[in-house]
Amino acid sequence: MVSIRPDEISAILKQQIEDYDKSVSVSNVGTVLQVGDGIARVYGLDKVMAGELVVFEDGTEGLALNLEDDNVGVVLMGEGYGIQEGSTVKATGKIASVPVGEAMLGRVVNPLGQPMDGKGEIASTDVRLIENPAPGIIQRKSVHEPMQTGITAIDAMIPIGRGQRELIIGDRQTGKTAIAIDTIINQKSEDVVCVYVAIGQKAASVAQVTEVLRERGALDYTVIVAAGASEAASLQYLAPYTGAAIAEHFMYQGKATLVIYDDLTKQAQAYRQMSLLLRRPPGREAYPGDVFYCHSRLLERAAKLSDAMGKGSMTALPIIETQAGDVSAYIPTNVISITDGQVFLSSDLFNSGLRPAINVGISVSRVGGAAQTKAIKKIAGTLKLELAQFDELAAFSQFASDLDAATQAQLGRGKRLRELLKQAQFSPLLLAEQVAIVYAGTKGLLDELPVEKVTEFVRELRDYLKTSKPEFINAIQTEKVMSESSEAILKDAIKQVVSGLLVAA
């Protein structure tokens, strides 16, 4: 028979009392009243914050957007097939945040910062809130450094500066994304961190962009944030803010950054869908009243920081898709009024063979002129005016039978300028090459050359300068100014190439 010893029992009880965990966990919990269309109505969650992350029983995350008297409207960040009426919801006490830092470079992530490229977890210790206030007036400096796109038409006539917001606007299939990708590729030697945000695009399109950047060595300094067409509306809505947060981290470290939002039309549509399902009152074109604020608070985060803040910059290139060239619709007019200028792409010009299809007449850069390099500013001053006059004359000359010599000469020069500004995709030019091409056109050095030979002239001149006159390219690239000696070298080079082409003809 086993003897019971009271001292042993008391020792065991004492040990168990000592090991007892007294910690109490308090959770803010609610119950699902209704779920459907990516929206859940939740009862409870009394102390939830606006924009707070909540977690459902099946692990789906949500964002508390509507805080009402008797329920909370939550948008789901996933399919949420496992959520049922009566399921519990737990508030996390956290606002949506994203990992940031060097570890993000070269990666493809979703709007919550989770990897989508199959390269494993992102080893980043830094985290930043997705929504952040924009820098204040005192923290900013006026735009004064150029952001070279490598596209002659833009760098010469619609220059973009670091810290600027320049809208790229046009119908579908007019080359909007191509301009953005060219700009990223052109930053290879500029030490600029790039963020490409794909909103509501086909997965195949995002894969194609990723491959193009990888082939050209641009993925090493680029982060891709993708919220595809099949993703929840909440993720498409959040994607641009995630891109801004990733770029902000580098901006506040004193680096230059470039963010492409491709495109904000789809983000506005996702926000409209969420707002209507949350029963918010619709306004013009059924968009909610705060859709302007949705875009303005995003684009105001782009800035050129003051010296005291570390001299960093964030340049934003938002893209907007128009319907049949209508720039007077609600979202296009909103974004035009927020940004510092726009590059307007025309489907008529695109179909006529002018690529990039930039309509120079209504494209403008409101602050970039201050950032333009002296070398190209000096020679491109008349370019925009000459092209505008050419467009006017070309329309007039269709009805006029006999034109005087001066008008014919002006039309001839306009045609040559148009040809000079044609540029193949994924082939950005050096500043020195742009200077040489624009100089040849505006100074009338190509007036004798047949129009069909202009494209060949551009190719020959670039090769000639690289092989025979590297001192010209080095001088322009380093000094950013056209000296008298450089001008003499360039004039001689242009004459050599033109005479060679005329002899061949």
Swiss-Prot record:
Major location (coarse): membrane
EC number: 7.1.2.2
Recorded GO MF terms: ADP binding; ATP binding; proton-transporting ATP synthase activity, rotational mechanism
Positions bearing the site annotation: Required for activity: 363
Domain of life: Bacteria
Reactions catalysed according to its record: ATP + H2O + 4 H(+)(in) = ADP + phosphate + 5 H(+)(out)
Keyword annotations from UniProtKB, A to Z: ATP synthesis, ATP-binding, CF(1), Hydrogen ion transport, Ion transport, Membrane, Nucleotide-binding, Thylakoid, Translocase, Transport
Record's bilayer topology term: Peripheral membrane protein
Subcellular localization: Cellular thylakoid membrane
PANTHER family according to UniProt: ATP SYNTHASE SUBUNIT ALPHA, MITOCHONDRIAL
Similarity comment: family membership: Belongs to the ATPase alpha/beta chains family.
Function: Produces ATP from ADP in the presence of a proton gradient across the membrane. The alpha chain is a regulatory subunit.
Protein name as it appears in the record: ATP synthase subunit alpha
Organism: Synechococcus sp. (strain RCC307)
